[in-house]
A protein has these predicted regions:
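N-terminal membrane-proximal hinge/A-helix region immediately C-terminal to the signal-anchor transmembrane segment
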Residues: 1-103, 118, 122-130, 150, ...
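Cytochrome P450 heme-thiolate monooxygenase catalytic core
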Residues: 1-8, 75-85, 100, 116-271
């Protein structure tokens, strides 16, 4: 049967697109659970933009077929993640298609296997022990802030090779500011719904995001420039790996590609 016809025959979530988009932004797990209960383990959604006409699967065997099948029936178009462009740019692995996507994955995946994962695990345990050692008996702890501190320290050390210093503190502080804009459903709507992406000054959610992102961009490009000038092939952090990588024609990654991949790793690692 024609794939387009098969897709057309799938049960489709019936609520209006704006309501679905709001539910997706504010309560994504409830939205998917409720849709599965009403429409079954394979259903289609209709939202605006890149989330229009998407098919969701919850059956484990169907998911396995999509992820591991060798017949190339299923693609992973980067456009499906277009809603993340304001955060990640458009040259990170999540936004790439086809051969470019596979090539970038092959470059990155060795950093998340075997000995590398064990090193990251040891680092997480050390950072956690050091943090907990500073707690006092009967002291009230904001656990979310403590866990965020661990996450960001791990990211900055494994991705950038930064352990301390002015740029470490600047990137960490600015990243926290940008991430904080996604913590409220109301603020998130201004970041992810195109019609609400209006720069009304630094006091507006979108305006504040643009200004925070601009500062973070400058910090990342400055770090990339410093690392290119002082490239050390024996360093093991991911930024060093990406700077030293070459494609089949011997071309390296551009500053924009490096920046977008770093943003992807920063946000994905934090989540």
């Amino acid at each position: 049967m024609n794939q387009n016809l098969m897709t057309a025959l799938l049960p489709t979530v019936k609520s209006p697109s704006p309501i679905q988009l709001w539910q997706w932004i504010t309560e994504p797990l409830d939205y998917m659970d409720n849709s599965e209960r009403e429409y079954g383990d394979i259903f289609k959604i209709r939202m605006s933009g890149v989330l229009n006409n998407c098919v969701f699967l919850s059956d484990p065997k169907a998911i396995q077929q999509v992820l591991t099948g060798t017949d190339k029936q299923f693609a992973a178009p980067g456009s499906i993640n277009g809603i993340l462009k304001p955060f990640l740019g458009d040259r990170g692995v999540l936004l790439l298609d086809g051969g470019e996507h596979r090539q970038r994955r092959q470059l990155l995946m060795p950093q998340f296997h075997g000995d590398k994962i064990r090193v990251y695990t040891e680092l997480i345990c050390k950072l956690t022990r050091d943090l907990v050692a500073g707690w006092q008996v009967d002291e009230t702890i904001n656990l979310r802030e403590q866990m965020q501190s661990i996450s960001l320290s791990v990211i900055l050390q494994t991705v950038f090779g930064l352990y301390e210093g002015e740029r470490y503190e600047q990137i960490q502080a600015k990243l926290i500011q940008v991430i904080s804009l996604t913590e409220s459903p109301v603020k998130s709507s201004f970041l992810f719904i195109p019609a609400l992406q209006q720069d009304l000054g630094a006091w507006s959610p979108w305006g504040r995001f643009l200004r925070d992102r601009e500062v973070l961009d400058r910090l990342l490009y400055a770090e990339i420039a410093d690392r290119r000038r002082n490239y050390q092939p024996d360093r093991s952090d991911i930024l060093n790996l990406l700077i030293g990588s070459k494609d089949a024609e011997g071309n390296g990654m551009s500053d924009i590609e490096l920046h977008d991949e770093l943003m992807t790793l920063l946000f994905a690692g934090h989540e």
